[in-house]
Amino acid sequence: MANDHPPRPSRRGFLKAGSAAVAAGASLGATGVAQAALGKTPAHGADPQTAVEPFYGLHQGGIVTPQQSHTYVAALDLTTEKREDVIALLRVWTDAAARLTQGATAGPLPTGAAAKTALADTKIDTQVETKADAKANDTAYSPTNAKAAPDSGDVLGLGPCGLTITFGFGPGLFTKDGKDRYGLASRRPAALVDLPRFNGDQLIAEKTGGDLFIQACANDQQVAFHAVRQLARLAYGTAAMRWGQSGFLSGPRGQTPRNLMGFKDGTNNPSTAKPQLMNEFVWAGATADAPWMEGGTYTVVRRIRITLEHWDNTEVDFQEQVFGRHKYSGAPIGKKNEFDPVNLKEEDKDGNPVIPENSHVRLSNQASNNGAQILRRSYSYNDGTNFYIERWPPWRQETEYDAGLIFVAHQSDPRTGFIPINDKLAKFDMMNQFTTHVGSAVFAVPPGAKPGSYIGAGLFET
């Protein structure tokens, strides 16, 4: 891991490596930040800590963006009854996210001798707080305390780290307890269906659902968490945290990451470099019921605990039969290279399928699912240990790892993507004896925002 994820630079070292994004974000006014966030193409730096991703655009970032090394995903429940409060929150979130992705603070920093002294180590320029900024701080940036800091300050000097922030809307934004909510029930996309209960699900309410979704991805764990932390604070009084989860990648950058089971995860993804595939499988079109979703996507998040203790005591040959791939190369069984095509018709000398009938690769393959594909952008998680009773032999009852996969999948329609694919996996996949789905959510992720507008404007204003 040390070679895969370079150590973060010191605050002074970051300045030498290129602190322009942070300095610009802190010293420019709102217009300057918006212009920086509008970058036509990602400004990938040689150092992952200085990489900058644009915020504004046709699509939201964090979907087809090259995967960063860390994530923090969260869902919030709306507590307000007023439609205008939701719009106000989305405006504030959009402005803050545009700043954060450029390496700036969530709100304009205060000025004065004390502030300058505190920032001396980071060499971040302070923005001159105008009357308009002060009013914004009093209303938007400090919803519960007008004197609260506009930013927690825990990532000052760390750089943008390729941060992307993605927002989504859960079914609860449209209806609650069967009743219209905020006048949006008629605008709920047909594709935003409630996920069915799948075989083997052991969902925990506190890790399931949510009205609003935030996904922050960055090349630094603290930067990803910091982004969600600021946005959650800005939501005080309008929305409350329902669940949150951090995650990480394993593997060299630019290569398919490995999950905690030691296998490469995402090899058969549709290529994000091919627009025709993204338009077919990932980006939503302008349907009659939800024209505002054109250019957006539908995101499924599943928290999947893996019984690592059980898995670690199985033979590699068996593990490869479970996956349908060779563990170390990532190649399909019987092949040599990771990206060799999967041949589901190939048989051994005895007439048995080379790739087992109930292997993960066969059951999830496009050829086994009427041509359906989803874009997986998953992360591993490790939350320490807990006491568990295993649901498969040997049915151990002991303290085990609370670790596994934050499964994240984007698609143009869950009804033809995740739902039928996972229904088959939940019934027949050999991997089920090592995994348990304990969290689940689905969100409509609207298209990107334009400068001066906000995420989801098409839903509320057209």
Feature roles, as predicted:
Residues 1-9:
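N-terminal secretory signal peptides
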Residues 13-33, 38-462:
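Long, histidine/aromatic-enriched segments associated with O2/redox biology
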